[in-house]
Each structure stands twice: as C-alpha cells, then as structure tokens.
UniProtKB/Swiss-Prot annotation:
It is found in: Plastid, Chloroplast. Its main location: plastid. It holds the Pfam family MatK_N. This is Maturase K. One of its GO terms (molecular function) is RNA binding. Belongs to the intron maturase 2 family. MatK subfamily. Keywords: Chloroplast, mRNA processing, Plastid, RNA-binding, tRNA processing. Usually encoded in the trnK tRNA gene intron. Probably assists in splicing its own and other chloroplast group II introns. The keyword tRNA processing applies.
Length: 506
C-alpha cells in the first residue's frame, strides 16, 4: 500500500489525468512483477531473453494506434501486426500494466474509506471466506426459502469497460484499453463467443477479474439500493462502495422504471428477514416469509441483468426452494436445514402429555463426489476413488514425498473441519494415505506390503490421522477435549483467505 501511495503521488505531481501516463512508466511493470500471483509472466518462452523491454512495450502501443479498426475482416485474427515480438508475452505484460494502473487509486480509496469508518480491525476479521458460515448457522435456521443464483457473465467485454468508466474519468486510458482488447485478445467482432471471453480470462486473469469484480459491484450496489427502497429497516452490510459521478442519478433512473411495482406492491409485503450472501459469481438469497417476495426479487434480478447490463438470463435459471427440502452449494460445502424431531413426556397431576418438539439445524457437509473428482484429476486416485501412485513425484526423497501428501491432507483438514459429518473427510485422508504409500513403493520398486514391512513406515504415515487431533488438543483443555467431541463439533478457521484448485496445490 505504501508503494502504491508513493507512485500515485509521483504521478499526480506530473499532471491531473495521471492514469494514462502510468502505462509508460518502468516502475509500474516492476510493481506488476513483484505482485504476479505466484506465476512469472515476465519470463518469455524459449528463444527469447529472460527479461522484457519497456521500449518494445511502447512500440507495440504505438502500433496499436496505427491499426485501422473500422474495417473488420474474418481473417484479421490470423494476422500478427507485431512481427519480431512474442505477442503472447507482451500481451501479458500490457495486461498486467493495465491491472496495476487501475488498481492503484482504488486501493487508496478503499484504505481511506475504511479509516474514516474506523472498521479496519473488523474488516480484517471478516476477510476469511469461512466467516460466512457462522452467519449462516445463526440466521438460516430461522428462514424457510432459499434461492440459489448464478450471476451471469456479460456477453461482451465492452460492458465491463463501460462500467469501469463510471469510476475512472480518463478517456485516453480507456481508448488504449479498447485497442489492446482488439489487437491482443481478438476482440474483432461485434458478438464475441463465450470461448473467446473464456480464453481472455485465462490468459489475462488479473485484468479480467478486476473488470468482472466491478461488474458484480455495480450489480450489488443497485440491488442494495432497491432493497433499501423496499424496506424501512436499515441494511447492515460489510460492503464498501465509493462515490462517483452519475452514480446516484443512474440508480434513481432505475427506480423510476420499477416505480409502479415498488409503490403499490412492496409496501404491503415488507420482509425484514431477507438475507443475501455471495462468493465470486454465486449468491444465495434467503427469506422467512412466503415465496411471494422471492418471486418478486427473481423478477427484478432478471430485468436488471437484461435491461441494465445487456445480459440475457432465463427465469428458470433461478430456483426458489424450501430450505428443509433443498441443499445449496457454497464454498465447497453442501448446506441444508435439517428438522430434528423429539418427543417430550410431560405430566400434570394425573394426566400425561406427549409434546413433539421440532428444532432446525444447519447441516454443512463435505461433498465427497466433487472431491474424489479433484483427486482423480490430480492423479491421486481413479474416478471410482481407488488410490493410485503418483509416479511424477517418485524422483523426490521419501521425506519430500510424505511432506507433499501431508501438506495437501493438512490443507483439506483445515478447510473442511467445519463439516458436521467428518466421515467423508476421513475417506479423503485414507485415499491420500494409500496414494502416498503406493508412491513410495513405486519409487523403491517394491510392493506396498513389502515396503511397509521393510521400512516400518506405519507410524510415520499415522500423521495423516493424528496431526489434526494433536493440534486441537493444544487449543482446548485436555479435561474437556475428547475424540468424540472432535468428530461431532464444527471448527471454523478464520485465517483462510482464498482456496486453490487441488491440482495446483503442488
């Protein structure tokens, strides 16, 4: 953050429209190199030097301005106007430069907003992606209906660029961004396919995620505004939104479109118990009352995406279900509300009564089938869940092989300890344990039984099952901690900030 502030003040001292000149500064690409998300994008492929040239970046930007984009041809995508350069390499360089430049002012605005609101400490506490589950345990047991919503992707990247223009008033920067999308990302047709957008998101993940997050933020800001208009209660949220030109005017215009519905319908059906949570492109909307309001919000969501963001969405893609009969998936868990029925015998004088008590409990379960698919994709087992060896790791030492398997097993235990039923988690540990043994046996060119008998590795491999219990025994008092309690209780670790694919966990 201090580095961002220094570079921003240096740019502000030069001229008022500071974003565009930053594209041509050497330290911007040095900053992108130090924040490359664990992947060295500034190392070219074979046949190129292991460093980039800022002079080549400037030359490519100049050539982008010289291209004629008024004539669109089907053969344009096969032409490479940047002969003599590694186009993919410099495409990633300029993409990272764009992402760094547009991130700088928003990092500073976010920091100043949090300081003014005096919520920096609480903001750090809710950064964990698992902080949502204690909220679900407290609130969802009192709710009856849930809607599982997948936020649709925009059909054209131009929509993402236009949304960003409401935040940053720098015309040359956005003009250069469009030229970049045309030249490097094959954005040379009026209706790009999903495949082209998917390719752009994989080759330029930082820039695409930045643009997509602004799209989601814009959608959520309008949703929160409409919700506040339909309820007299104050909305409590951890979201932080920034002021910008034409922001409220655009919101008010949207309210005028739905003024009839809000004026005559919603005031008679107030619902203070509506809850909304989101992670990445998936959100959950839950309510306590009859599903009338849920259908109303479904109607508003679809019209909001179609009329305001030009994103087509079918009504059948948003389902409304009862929580007691439907399970929803969020952050790698399957969650549903289970009804617990118990009978209590009550005696009053000579009469005896049987009272049936129904209580609700939120069940959060480990999805065993998706996890086995991930293990099979990473070559730890087959599609049926039978453990197999990992020959790729056979060149490492025994200690490194065991440590790799333990690291994956430790991360899975850390992430899924909030499950109410840990039987599936123990099955995953069992698969990893046998895969580790088979990998060691493959390295020593022996059978599993002969390897275990010769090396006596049973005690060492027991760490797959005992390490987590030893850690928890240090946290809880020994007199109150039992293995049975560990199996049944849920433990949420609020230090998990993101989740990686199991395949990339090596």
């Amino acid at each position: 953050m201090k580095e961002y502030r220094v570079y921003l003040e240096r740019a502000r001292s030069r001229q008022q429209d500071f974003l565009y000149p930053l594209i041509f500064r050497e330290y911007i690409y040095g900053l992108a190199y130090s924040h490359n998300f664990n992947r060295s994008i500034f190392v070219e492929n074979g046949g190129y030097d292991n460093k980039y040239s800022l002079l080549n970046v400037k030359r490519l930007i100049t050539r982008m301005y010289q291209q004629n984009h008024l004539i669109i041809s089907t053969n344009d995508s096969n032409k490479n106007p940047f002969l003599g350069y590694n186009k993919n390499f410099y495409s990633q360089i300029i993409s990272e430069g764009f992402a760094i430049v547009v991130e700088i002012p928003f990092f500073l605005q976010l920091s100043s907003s949090l300081e003014e609101a005096e919520i920096i400490k609480s903001y750090k506490n809710v950064r964990s992606i698992h902080s949502i589950f204690p909220f679900l345990e407290d609130k969802f047991t009192y709710l009856n209906y849930v809607s599982d919503i997948r936020i649709p992707y925009p059909i054209h990247l131009e929509i993402l660029v236009q949304i960003l223009r409401y935040w940053v008033k720098d015309v040359p920067l956005f003009h250069l961004l469009r030229l970049f999308l045309y030249d490097f990302c094959n954005w040379n047709c009026f209706t790009p396919t999903k495949k082209s957008i998917s390719t752009f998101s994989k080759s330029n993940p930082r820039l695409f995620l930045f643009l997509y997050n602004f799209y989601v933020c814009e959608y959520e800001s309008i949703f929160l505004f409409l919700r506040n208009k339909s309820s007299h209660l104050r909305l409590k949220s951890f979201s932080v939104f920034f002021e910008r030109i034409f922001f409220y005017a655009k919101r008010e215009h949207l309210v005028e479109v739905f003024s009839k519905d809000f004026s005559y319908t919603l005031p008679f059906f107030k619902d203070p118990n509506i809850h909304y949570v989101r992670y990445q492109g998936k959100c959950i909307l839950a309510s306590k009352n009859v599903p009338f309001l849920m259908n109303k919000w479904k109607h508003y969501f679809i019209h909001l995406w179609q009329c305001f963001f030009d994103v087509w969405s079918q009504p059948r893609t948003i389902d409304i279900n009862q929580l007691s009969e439907h399970s929803f998936q969020l952050l790698g868990y399957f969650s549903n509300v289970r009804l617990n029925r118990s009978v209590v015998r009550s005696q009053m004088l000579e009469n005896t009564f049987l009272i049936e008590i129904v209580s609700k409990k939120l069940d959060i379960i480990v999805p065993i089938i998706p996890l086995i698919r991930s293990l099979a994709k990473a070559k730890f087992c087959n599609v049926l869940g039978h453990p197999i060896s990992k020959p790729v790791w056979a060149d490492s030492s025994d200690f490194d092989i065991i440590e790799r398997f333990l690291r994956i097993c430790r991360n899975l235990s850390h992430y899924y300890n909030g499950s109410s039923k840990k039987k599936s988690l123990y099955r995953i540990k069992y698969i990893l344990r046998l895969s580790c043994i088979k990998t060691l046996a493959c390295k020593h060119k022996s059978t599993v039984r002969a390897f275990l008998k010769r090396s006596g590795s049973e005690e060492l491999l027991e760490e797959f099952f005992t390490e987590e219990e030893e850690i928890l025994s240090l946290i809880f008092p020994r007199d109150s901690f039992t293995l049975h309690r560990f199996h049944r209780n849920r433990i949420w670790y609020l230090d998990i900030l993101f989740s990686n694919d199991l395949v990339n966990d090596e």
